[in-house]
């Protein structure tokens, strides 16, 4: 059961009520999941790998249908059914890298000999002043050729394009992982201004906690598909005695790992089979997957 503060109200920017979700032929990821975030908040979404953070963000972004129209609401509208949320730019999602799935090779980076200018100026209906501000903020060279630049430079262009339209709710999934420290801190300051000046709401999933103690207003901790904790940053008792947020989250995750190990059933020892040396049981060379 999550520890919640008293911020839930009719003015919530995000409201999830009794959500259940599972991928096809798999066990449920979320069961009776609830989340309420007020407008203007900056919420850190933390948890171990595989806890459900990315899936939750995609559900909030309207990429997965769950339950009825009132189960997942963003700005008092159905995240999945109200497509105008995304089309208008009110709801924006930034996550993952520019990649495509190619056969059994998995995901590979998108390739294309086009400039950053071509991509950024190709987004229609944008404010030129906001566009120039983002280009300057992210230190983007409009002459960059996108098939030649680094992952961090590609990420800057991706972020710029995703922020060109003023958002009301922004969902971020590890978008700063490729950025250097200066670009990351400048971007976080921009997000803070968007919340303070325009009342925007941000949910930010990350494993990099430097400088976030004073940036975030709320923290949501997901443990194995459950909302273990939801509280204001000022109400987290551990932060008052710990040197930083990293130490606090680390202690939570280590406790979680110990609990999982206690519940884990012992694995039966491997026994050789007479068929192991059979030519019909050979495996592909690992180079196939490189």
UniProtKB/Swiss-Prot annotation:
UniProt keyword list: ATP-binding, Cytoplasm, Nucleotide-binding, Transport
Domain ABC transporter: 14-249
Major localization listed first in the record, in broad terms: cytoplasm
Family annotation (InterPro entries): AAA+_ATPase, ABC_transporter-like_ATP-bd, P-loop_NTPase
UniProt-listed Pfam families: ABC_tran
CC terms in the record's Gene Ontology section: cytoplasm
Gene Ontology molecular function terms on file: ATP binding; ATP hydrolysis activity
Residues noted as binding ATP in the record, renumbered to the chain: 47-54
Domain of life assignment: Eukaryota
Induction: By sucrose.
Subcellular localization: Cytoplasm
Family according to the record: Belongs to the ABC transporter superfamily. ABCI family.
UniProt xrefs under PANTHER family: SKFA PEPTIDE EXPORT ATP-BINDING PROTEIN SKFE
Name assigned to this protein: ABC transporter I family member 19
Organism classification: Eukaryota, Viridiplantae, Streptophyta, Embryophyta, Tracheophyta
Name of the gene encoding the protein in the UniProt record: ABCI19
């Amino acid at each position: 059961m999550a520890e919640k503060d008293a911020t839930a109200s009719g003015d919530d920017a995000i409201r999830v009520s009794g959500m259940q979700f599972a991928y096809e032929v798999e066990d449920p990821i979320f069961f009776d999941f609830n989340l309420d975030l007020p407008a203007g908040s900056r919420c850190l979404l933390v948890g171990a790998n595989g806890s459900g953070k990315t899936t939750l963000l995609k559900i909030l972004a309207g990429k997965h249908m769950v339950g009825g129209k009132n189960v997942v609401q963003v700005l008092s509208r159905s995240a999945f059914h109200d497509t105008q949320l995304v089309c208008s730019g009110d709801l924006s999602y930034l996550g993952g890298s520019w990649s495509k799935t190619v056969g059994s090779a998995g995901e590979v980076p998108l390739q294309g000999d086009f400039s950053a200018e071509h991509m950024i100026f190709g987004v229609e209906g944008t404010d030129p002043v906001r566009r120039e501000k983002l280009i300057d903020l992210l230190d983007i060279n409009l002459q960059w050729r996108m098939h030649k630049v680094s992952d961090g430079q590609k990420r800057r262009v991706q972020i710029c394009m995703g922020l060109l339209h003023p958002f009301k709710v922004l969902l971020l999934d590890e978008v700063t992982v490729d950025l250097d420290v200066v670009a990351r801190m400048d971007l976080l300051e921009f997000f803070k201004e968007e919340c303070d000046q325009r009342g925007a709401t941000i949910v930010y999933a990350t494993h990099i906690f430097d400088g976030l103690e004073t940036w975030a207003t709320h923290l949501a901790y997901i443990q194995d598909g459950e909302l273990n904790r939801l509280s204001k940053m000022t109400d987290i008792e551990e932060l008052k005695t710990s040197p930083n947020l990293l130490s606090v989250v680390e202690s939570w995750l280590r406790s979680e790992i110990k609990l999982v190990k206690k519940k884990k059933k012992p694995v039966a020892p491997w026994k050789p089979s007479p068929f192991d040396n059979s030519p019909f049981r050979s495996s592909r060379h690992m180079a196939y997957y490189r």
